[in-house]
Amino acid sequence: MSAGVAVESTALPSAPGLNVYETVAAAIGNTALVRLNAVTEGIEAAVYAKLEFLNPGGSVKDRAARSMIEAAESSGELAPGGTVVEGTSGNTGIGLAMVAASRGYRTIVVVPDKTSAEKVAFLRAHGAEVRVTEGARPTDHPDHVRNIARRIADETPGGWLAGQYDNPANIGAHYASTGPELWQQTGGRITHFVAGIGTGGTISGTGRYLKEVSDGFVTVVGADPLNSTYNGGDGRAYYIESIGHFLHPDSPEDIWPECYDRSVVDSILTVTDREAITTVRALARREGLLVGGSGGAAVAAALRLARTLPADATVVVLIPDSGRAYLSKYFDDDWVARLGFDDRTGDVAVTDLLGDTLDPLTVPSDATVAEALEVLGDRPELPVVLRRTPSSLVVAEIVGSVTRNDLIAANPTSVVTEHLSVPLSVVGAFESLGAAVKRIGADTRTVVVAESGIVSGLLSAGQLTDRSSGERSGR
C-alpha cells in the first residue's frame, strides 16, 4: 500500500459464514450440532449433540461469562482495571478468565478440591489467580467456595463477584443465543432438549426460549446425578463435575440457585457415576467425541429418553465441555480402576475377598473420641466420613482416618476431626489382587474397597498381600 493513502479500517470483512471476529468474546457461540450414530444403535429417533466445547474457552460457560461481564460493564459494577471474582467448579472461571484477559481485567477464581487438575491449569494459563479449597463444606462455613469468593470480591478494590448461580445474565445468555441457535439449526424440528442441571442457567434459558418459540411443543429434560437434591436425592457426593446439587449434611438448608427455573424442566432423568463414565468412554471410542463427565451424563439420559420415542422425534443433547479437561479422571484407566468403575477381568479380584461381610464400619465426622473408640473396638484404624443417615457411603465423603493409638491418648470429649490422619488407601473391587497390592505399596493400614465409587468393604493390608502371595505360588 502506498504512503499517504487513508485506510478507513484494518478489520477483515465479517459476514455470516466467514467466522471472522475482532475479539475472542465475539467468537463465542454458534457451535456445531452433530448427529450421534454409533451409540444410538437400535434407536429410531434422531439424536444430535450440541458441541459446546467448541467455544473458545472450551465450554458452554463461555456464553454466561461473556453475558455476565457485559451486563456488569453496562451497570457500572465492573469498571476498567477491575477484578473479576468467582467461585466455580472450573468452567465458568475459565470463561471469565478468558473474557477478562481480553478486556484487561484481573481474575481470581475459587475452586473446590475435586476440580480436575486440567481445569486448574487452564485457569492459570489465562492468568487467573486460583484458590483451591475443600469442597465438602456446609454452605454457611466461612471457607465454602462461594463464601470465600464473596469475601475476596468485597475485600478487593474494584472487585466484582460474577455470582453465576443467581445472576440473571446467566439465563439470559442461553435465552439469547443457545436456544435460538438450536431452533435455527434444527429448522424448528427439535422435539426434546436434554441438558444437565448445574447452576440451572443453561437448561432454564435454553429451555424457556425453545418452549416459547415452539408454543410449548418442545419437551425439556434434565440429566442429574443420582445423589443430587435436584431430583430428590439426599445430596451425597458424586464424581461427575459441574452438574447436580451437593448438600453437605451440616448445611442449615438446601438453597438452590435462582438461575434454576424448575417450571421450565418437564422431567429429570437420574444418571449414576458409572453410567456417565461408561458413556464418555463409549463416545470417545465409538463416536470420536471426547466429552466431559457432565456431557456423558446428559448423553446417557438422552439415549434412555430416545429409546422411548418414535422415528419422527429429534432429540438435542447439550455437551458442556471437552474430555480434555478430565484426562486424569474419567479417561485414566488407573483412576477408573481404583474407584471400582471398571469391569472385572477373569482374574481373582479384590471383591472376592470380601465375602458376605456386613456394611463397612466407619466413624462419623461429628463423633467424639469416646464414641469413635467404641466403634473402633480392637481395630487399629477406621475411615472417618461425613455424617449421614445410614446409606451407601461415597468414597469422596471420606475425610480422613483415625487410629486407635492416637485416640487413646486424646481427650474423650473432643471431636474426632481434631485427630485425623491421612485417608486410608483405596483399591477397586474389580482390580486383580496383584494390582491392588501394587497400589497400596508399603501401606500396612486398613484398605478401603470401592465399587462404582461406593465403599463396598474394608480389608486389612495383610489379607490382600497374603492372598496375592498365595495366588502367585499357586495355592
Language-model regions, residue ranges each:
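Terminal peptide-recognition signature
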Residues: 100, 123, 182, 288, ...
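Structural motif
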Residues: 86-87, 110, 133, 196, ...
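Short hydrophobic beta-strand segments in globular cytosolic domains
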Residues: 393, 398-399, 426, 450, ...
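Short hydrophobic beta-strand motif reused across regulatory alpha/beta modules
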Residues: 399-403, 407, 456-464
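Bateman (tandem CBS) regulatory domains
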Residues: 261-264, 346-361, 367, 413-424
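PLP-dependent amino-acid enzyme catalytic core
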Residues: 1-351
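The conserved cystathionine-beta-synthase
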Residues: 361-389, 425-452, 461-475
